[in-house]
A protein has these predicted regions:
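ATP-dependent adenylation/nucleotidyltransferase module used to activate substrates
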Residues: 2-5, 11-194, 250, 269-280, ...
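Short, aliphatic-rich beta-strand segments
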Residues: 78, 245-256
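Short, low-order "capping/linker" segments at domain edges
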Residues: 293-304
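Flexible glycine/acidic-rich beta-alpha junction loops that bind and position SAM and/or redox cofactors
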Residues: 204-216, 249-253, 290-295
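Mid-to-C-terminal catalytic subdomains of enzymes
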Residues: 179, 183, 187-233, 238-242
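Alpha-helix N-cap and loop-to-helix initiation/capping positions
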Residues: 34, 126, 218-221, 263-266
Length: 304
């Protein structure tokens, strides 16, 4: 599989566009131009490729990459979605729906990260083993079909936080066209909105194993319980929610503007009773709300 280099001029984070404000504001036109330059750089880079596999989860980033690649290369793009216990069915459904709506070539494959003891042990670099499993499959598909490039949806904001999963794509020569073009999450949401992608305002997503504290074993039973608990919250109208699984305790991380609603007596009773019916003994609401990589906080405490 070949690895190519995109040569682009990146704008700084302070130059990224915002969906807030009006066109008449003094900074709107330069910001819009900056976004359009990034989009043009992405389109040019994609058009230089003969064919491409997109690691397509159906999240904000990979959905936009799939859209942009399909726009540039048409049927020469294959979007591949992994099906495993760690991947919520809700997200697979979104991936299928968007692929059908926009006409992507879409393939769903089974991955077996749960068969890897090193993954189930849930070390701090658990994501590496999951990504290694995924790209082992994608590399095989690429070889069978003569597709020279695999790409993921990493963006320019993903350089922060603790992300051991990024090592695996580097080992397989996976490209990150959104990152290479300087596109941030905010940029991608705005471009997705313009393109009519229903994923443009989807909350950030991560695999279900990310709800389990490091060094606590990942099991099929835990993943099913977490998925069912989060489905309860989605059905109750909560958009941003993570059920952090602490054995018999469900610690709910919600959007900051949704915490008050969860604590209303009637709603609190509904959440508590439904999650206890699933098997949790205690249900708590984290007063700090949802934050990216919150379980990494425990890693930092272990290092003190």
């Amino acid at each position: 599989m070949t690895k190519e280099t995109i040569s682009t001029t990146r704008t700084t984070r302070s130059g990224r566009t915002s969906t807030r404000g009006t066109v008449g504001e003094a900074t709107s036109l330069p910001l819009a131009a900056s976004l359009e330059r990034k989009e043009a750089a992405l389109d040019l880079a994609l058009r230089e490729l003969p064919s491409l596999i997109v690691a397509y989860s159906g999240g904000v980033d990979s959905a936009y990459l799939a859209y942009a690649a399909h726009r540039a290369l048409g049927s020469s793009v294959l979007c591949v979605t992994a099906d495993s216990p760690s991947y919520p069915e809700r997200h697979r459904a979104i991936a299928r729906r968007v692929a059908e709506q926009f006409g992507f070539n879409h393939l769903v494959i089974q991955t077996e990260e749960m068969a890897r003891p090193e993954y189930r042990a849930n070390p701090a670099n658990r994501c590496y083993f999951c990504k290694h499993e995924l790209y082992t499959h994608l590399s095989a598909i690429a070889g069978e079909r003569g597709i020279p490039v695999i790409a993921d949806g990493s963006n320019a904001d993903d350089r922060g936080d603790y992300r051991p999963g990024r090592q695996a794509p580097r080992e397989f020569g996976v490209r990150s066209p959104l990152d290479e073009s300087g596109l941030t999450k905010e940029d991608i949401r705005e471009l997705s909105r313009r393109a009519g992608l229903p994923t443009w305002d989807e909350p950030a997503s991560a695999c279900l194993s990310s709800r389990i504290p490091y060094f606590s074993e990942v099991t099929d039973e835990k993943l099913r319980l977490i998925e069912r608990a989060e489905a309860v919250l989605h059905d109750l109208g909560f958009r941003i929610c993570r059920v952090r699984h602490h054995d018999t305790i469900a610690r709910l991380e919600l959007g900051r503007d949704e915490i008050a609603r969860a604590l209303e007596p009637e709603m609190a009773e509904t959440i508590d009773s439904q999650l206890r019916a699933l098997g949790y003994a205690h249900v708590t609401v984290d007063l700090r709300g949802y934050r990216l990589g919150s379980l990494n906080e425990a890693l930092r405490l272990r290092q003190v």
